[in-house]
């Protein structure tokens, strides 16, 4: 592959399409060599771009299915301002409705702790706040208007209330597999673009309620958690990618990506396989075959996204097909730095592994810059 160093890591990110020059400052990116828990769960001060990400499939007592996406972004820009953005979405399969909302706010620059006790005490009394708790544990503890996320290391409580829809949720998660440190240490080199921190908790057991049209619905299922930082440089306009996290009914999980620079021909593939016990296998470019087709054109943005995906991993004897449960799961976010457009939604997966039939669910991210 010309012009891009091989990425022998798992690559999974929330997709940001920016219609202007890269606004992020990388001056304060973390110069780490290994992830340390629980500290790595907390905010990094003035980071170029970092996020905390949950997606998954939940069901109610009637087996109706719902997709949930929840992301907190924190970023520091070249105008020396730290900001926070939250993205939230719910896919209602039964009624074929996709709900989403977002919020962007300026934040104080001392987000990355630990804070002095006097700063901490005054800060948490604000009406709108993001906070980092003091002490030996630095759990996630964010609150931004009607959105909150608390906990650490797979034990999370998340709440959301959308402004423009009578929709939201109140969910708690519990880990069922060990943390996955991508790049072995939890730091990865994205093709020479940046060295980013990256780890995941796959298959989080999830329970709680979803609210649709002011009605609370008890649900349960599994979700996938991603944590990344130092990612400002990967939002450049000439870089595109697609990503998926797949959970199969044999209790194994896959994370796969394809990345492309507009300056180069073809795609670069990578990912991670996680077996039923939580053991991981790094998947390199030559290990993966991904073919996408049958484009769907958004009636809102006029962008096109492939709806049918064929996945092959010969070394694991895996052959899968993946398709969304409904076409329109696109988000369009208007921010101070331009238009943020991406497709992210719940998909069905079926195929075979080691000659045996498997099926499952996935979340898929797609860009089309």
Which residues make up each language-model segment?
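Bacterial N-terminal signal peptides that target proteins for export
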Residues: 1-8
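Targeting-peptide/extracellular-domain and disordered-appendage signature
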Residues: 3, 20-369
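Bacterial N-terminal signal peptides
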Residues: 8-17
